[in-house]
């Protein structure tokens, strides 16, 4: 969804698409790069595709931030978390209808490999843990803007 969201932003210039790509992209794509769920390593094409695809999300969001001067506001954290919750809830029936091996947003089972989900409860309860982490990460992603805003308002 982050890929589609940043592409839609570039076509429409609607800030809502940027915001979703910003929070979901930096958290999801960032985690995907740090802990890839591919079973192969470099130079296998699946590994390269995975890394390039997720890097393009981050590059697209960074481009919008630098060139278009976009940034999130505090209220946007809540709006994007609400949208991500709706998407997460819709992913289970979509994965179910698609059948195995569909596991978009990892709602059916945990991703393979060593990653943070190893410390979470078994499926489907791991989604509660993932949701809590997503909330925390979205607020952490916003902290630099919060600090910047506080510093600017405290200057005479």
Name each model feature, range by range:
Residues 18-26, 50:
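Cytoplasmic-side transmembrane-helix entry/capping segments in multi-pass membrane proteins
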Residues 11-16, 36-48:
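Membrane-interface helix caps and helix-loop-helix hairpins in membrane proteins
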Residues 45-59:
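Membrane-interface loop-to-helix entry segments
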């Amino acid at each position: 969804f982050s890929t589609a969201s940043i592409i839609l932003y570039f076509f429409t210039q609607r800030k809502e698409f940027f915001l979703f790509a910003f929070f979901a992209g930096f958290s999801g794509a960032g985690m995907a790069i740090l802990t890839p769920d591919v079973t192969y390593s470099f130079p296998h094409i699946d590994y390269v595709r995975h890394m390039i695809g997720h890097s393009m999300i981050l590059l697209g969001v960074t481009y919008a931030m630098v060139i278009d001067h976009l940034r999130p506001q505090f209220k946007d954290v809540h709006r994007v978390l609400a949208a991500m919750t709706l998407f997460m809830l819709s992913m289970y029936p979509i994965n179910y209808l698609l059948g195995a091996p569909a596991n978009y947003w990892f709602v059916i089972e945990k991703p393979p490999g060593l990653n943070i989900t190893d410390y979470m409860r078994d499926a489907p309860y791991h989604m509660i843990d993932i949701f809590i982490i997503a909330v925390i990460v979205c607020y952490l992603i916003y902290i630099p803007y919060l600090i910047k805003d506080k510093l600017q308002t405290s200057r005479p």
